[in-house]
Amino acid sequence: MHVSIFAVGRMKKGAEQALVHHYLDRFSKSCSAVGFHFKILQEISESRAPTACQRMEEEGRRLIEFLPEKCRLIVLDERGKTVSSFAFAEQLGFYRDEGVRDVIIALGGPDGHNEQIRNRADFLLSFGFMTWPHQIARILLTEQLYRAVTIASNHPYHRF
């Protein structure tokens, strides 16, 4: 199963970007053992529209243009469900076992996702009630992807 991240905005070079690449590298090297394959980190340019509504609409259209047919879409959203690392790993495993070819995990821009994207989502995921800077959300996501693989393979990185 291919796993991709679609993120609105560009990540600047620095410690945060290095950490994202660190976890993506670990995920990529470990994921084939449990039937996953990291496909792409697709950056979608932020809209420069004057209002939040217009920006979310434009970014949502761009995101949808990149979605593969019949993919499962996990959307990071403050209104989403907060789950444990184990439950996140189970959800990915469920998609894999269903025979899903592509899972896309979408991170919105500063204004979040529009209603169309939230309605298209197969799963709305939240990293808690706090608001996280985009760079930190990317780090959290990539670490949790790596952790999901270690859970699925009973690797000691994730201790119960």
Curated annotation (Swiss-Prot):
One of its GO terms (cellular component) is cytoplasm. S-adenosyl-L-methionine binds at residues 76, 108, 127-132. One of its GO terms (molecular function) is rRNA (pseudouridine-N3-)-methyltransferase activity. It is found in: Cytoplasm. It comes from the Bacteria. Keywords: Cytoplasm, Methyltransferase, rRNA processing, S-adenosyl-L-methionine, Transferase. Its main location: cytoplasm. It catalyses: pseudouridine(1915) in 23S rRNA + S-adenosyl-L-methionine = N(3)-methylpseudouridine(1915) in 23S rRNA + S-adenosyl-L-homocysteine + H(+). Belongs to the RNA methyltransferase RlmH family. Specifically methylates the pseudouridine at position 1915 (m3Psi1915) in 23S rRNA. This is Ribosomal RNA large subunit methyltransferase H. It comes from Bartonella henselae (strain ATCC 49882 / DSM 28221 / CCUG 30454 / Houston 1). The lineage of its organism: Bacteria, Pseudomonadati, Pseudomonadota, Alphaproteobacteria, Hyphomicrobiales.
